[in-house]
């Protein structure tokens, strides 16, 4: 829903981080801050409570983070608080990671199999995906016994589902249509 705005904030922060050569540091810090907000019930309630003033939220963030993270990143978080966007931090992090991948001409491919790919399968898959997307591939392998067999690949919004589970589902649909 807020993807467009999240991307605008992400691009702005990415440009600052890139100029400072701190992209990885900023992403890591943002993830830690986001985890802290999510896992600390008190902080989460303060952030999400519209009755708590922006000034109070800014004071709390200042007391927690001011001297612990880069000043420009801290300023970015304060802007998010003032613009009432701090609750969208997860989406902003996802977008900044996408911007970073785009700028490095990379794409993440999530691959699900029942058993781990061997080296030749992995290399062949990466080669085919690099040709298809004309980008360097970051392969994230997931073992998923529920797919029964075959391979499932997701790159962005593209899905290649060559799993036995999917074939069974397709057969079930055909049986219901004809039956």
From Swiss-Prot:
Belongs to the ATPase delta chain family. The lineage of its organism: Bacteria, Bacillati, Bacillota, Clostridia, Eubacteriales. GO terms for cellular component: plasma membrane; proton-transporting ATP synthase complex. NCBIfam families: ATP_synt_delta (TIGR01145), PRK05758.2-4 (NF004403). One of its GO terms (molecular function) is proton-transporting ATP synthase activity, rotational mechanism. This is ATP synthase subunit delta. It is found in: Cell membrane. It is a peripheral membrane protein. Its main location: membrane. F(1)F(0) ATP synthase produces ATP from ADP in the presence of a proton or sodium gradient. F-type ATPases consist of two structural domains, F(1) containing the extramembraneous catalytic core and F(0) containing the membrane proton channel, linked together by a central stalk and a peripheral stalk. During catalysis, ATP synthesis in the catalytic domain of F(1) is coupled via a rotary mechanism of the central stalk subunits to proton translocation.
């Amino acid at each position: 829903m807020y993807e467009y705005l999240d991307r605008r904030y992400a691009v702005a922060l990415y440009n600052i981080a890139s100029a400072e050569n701190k992209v990885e540091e900023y992403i890591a810090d943002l993830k830690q801050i986001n985890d802290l907000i999510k896992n600390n019930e008190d902080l989460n309630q303060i952030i999400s409570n519209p009755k708590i003033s922006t000034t109070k939220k800014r004071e709390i963030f200042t007391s927690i983070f001011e001297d612990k993270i880069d000043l420009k990143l801290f300023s970015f978080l304060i802007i998010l608080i003032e613009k009432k966007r701090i609750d969208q931090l997860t989406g902003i992090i996802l977008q900044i990671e996408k911007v970073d991948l785009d700028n490095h001409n990379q794409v993440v491919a999530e691959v699900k199999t029942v058993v781990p790919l061997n080296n030749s399968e992995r290399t062949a898959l990466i080669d085919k995906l690099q040709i298809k997307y004309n980008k360097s591939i970051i392969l994230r392998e997931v073992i998923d016994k529920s797919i029964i067999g075959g391979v499932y690949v997701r790159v962005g919004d593209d899905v290649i589902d060559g799993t036995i589970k999917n074939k069974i589902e397709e057969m079930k649909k055909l049986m219901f249509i004809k039956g």
